[in-house]
A protein has these predicted regions:
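Polybasic low-complexity intrinsically disordered regions
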Residues: 1-105, 109-111, 116, 172-177, ...
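N-terminal cationic amphipathic segment used for targeting or macromolecule association
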Residues: 5-7, 121, 169, 183
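Short amphipathic alpha-helical segments, especially helix-boundary/capping motifs
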Residues: 37-41, 62-65, 124-130, 151-157
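Helix-centered, glycine/charged polyanion-binding patches within enzymatic domains
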Residues: 81-154, 162
């Protein structure tokens, strides 16, 4: 399985963006962050975590990987540069997967010798040798657009959460994900290039 991971924000409280710009923002605008992991082939959401807006992306990656059963092999994990951290690379390497994470612009090689650090240093060398654009094409980084599309589908079911309690907000998002996975299970259209 090729796992694609990203996160997005869902509004809980506060006015819309237009209202905030026109009339000034209210003092309280609350967001929840939803972290998704999808299977690239089936386009099914396999892992989900909901956090407050103050939690970063990188600390959640090991929890997302833990939601995939240990007996299921993960071939690769593709994420954005926010996950370029030792803990993320080590968690991916511990699952025996390849990490496709673009190194940060000011990245330096890591001195520690772990499987995750070695893989990250190889990716850093490749981006410096090939350039970022060619590395993205070579590594198949463009596949990450599938998770962006799936997050847009989550937002099509509602851009804000109705529940006030955090546990109920998590349940509300779990219902949305179950609905999306149900639609995905019905079938994915196959497109073919003409010409």
């Amino acid at each position: 399985m090729h796992l694609l991971i990203d996160s997005t924000g869902i509004k809980v409280e506060g006015e819309g963006e237009w209202h905030a710009r026109k009339h000034g923002g209210p003092k309280r605008r609350v967001w929840r962050k939803i972290h998704l992991g999808i299977d690239e082939e089936a386009l099914e959401i396999r892992a989900v975590e909901v956090t407050g807006s103050h939690i970063g992306d990188a600390p959640i990656l090991p929890d997302l990987l833990d939601q995939i059963p240990q007996d299921q092999e993960i071939a690769s994990v593709t994420t954005d540069g926010a996950y370029d951290r030792r803990k993320c690379h080590d968690a991916i390497a511990d699952r025996g997967a390849h990490a496709f994470i673009p190194p940060r612009k000011n990245a330096k090689p890591w001195r520690t010798i772990t499987a995750g650090a070695v893989a990250r240093n190889e990716a850093l060398r490749a981006t410096k040798y090939l350039g970022r654009a060619l590395w993205r094409r070579w590594s198949g980084y463009h596949r990450r657009s599938h998770v962006e599309t799936k997050m847009q589908c989550v937002k099509l079911l509602g851009q804000r959460l109705m529940a006030r309690d955090f546990d109920r907000q998590v349940a509300e998002l779990q219902v949305r994900i179950a609905v999306l996975n149900g639609y995905t299970a019905l079938g994915i259209p196959v497109t073919e290039a003409v010409g």
